[in-house]
A protein has these predicted regions:
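Structural alpha/beta surface segment adjacent to cysteine/selenocysteine redox centers
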Residues: 2-83
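C-terminal cap of thioredoxin/glutaredoxin-like
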Residues: 9, 80-153
Length: 153
């Protein structure tokens, strides 16, 4: 996911999302406790723009925080990123302990796995076409342009 965000998402955002030509939805699919906790902190933000900003920072710095097996150290690293973007540490601690939010995220993952047969991350859908292993900007651009061309009046 971090590689997609760094190498593809920013271009898609600039060329299509910011231009309001396509709608982008991000759905969490945590594969471990560190990813689950990162998503819990992302969801602490009420504002969608802030969520994407935080998500971007978490992906950019993933090689720094998602290391080792000490979940306390990992959580502190994620909270540091959140703090840098203005999230309150007390609120982040509350979010990390929110069992309802944890259950919701994990249930969303289970449902997505069942419904869409997701086997790996990131899995990208453009309309109903699934792109699981092919993550190249040119491929997505071609698919989007084809759809946009079809929808011209």
């Amino acid at each position: 996911c971090a590689s997609f965000h760094k190498n593809i998402f920013e271009e898609l955002k600039k060329d299509y999302i910011d231009q309001k030509l396509v709608k982008f939805e991000h759905h969490s699919f945590p594969l471990d406790l560190a990813a689950l906790n990162a998503e819990l902190i992302v969801r602490c933000h009420a504002d969608n723009q802030k969520k994407f900003q935080l998500l971007g920072e978490i992906y950019k710095k993933q090689n720094k925080w998602a290391v080792g097996s000490d979940i306390k150290k990992i959580n502190e690293s994620i909270k540091k990123i959140g703090s840098e973007l203005g999230l309150d540490k007390i609120k982040m601690n509350e979010c990390l302990k929110n069992e309802d939010a944890q259950d919701q995220i994990l249930n969303e993952r289970i449902e997505a796995q069942k419904k869409y047969k997701i086997q790996s991350t990131p899995t990208i859908f453009i309309n109903d076409k699934q792109y699981e292993n092919e993550h190249k900007y040119k491929l997505f651009k071609k698919a989007i342009e084809k759809i946009l061309k079809k929808n011209e009046i």
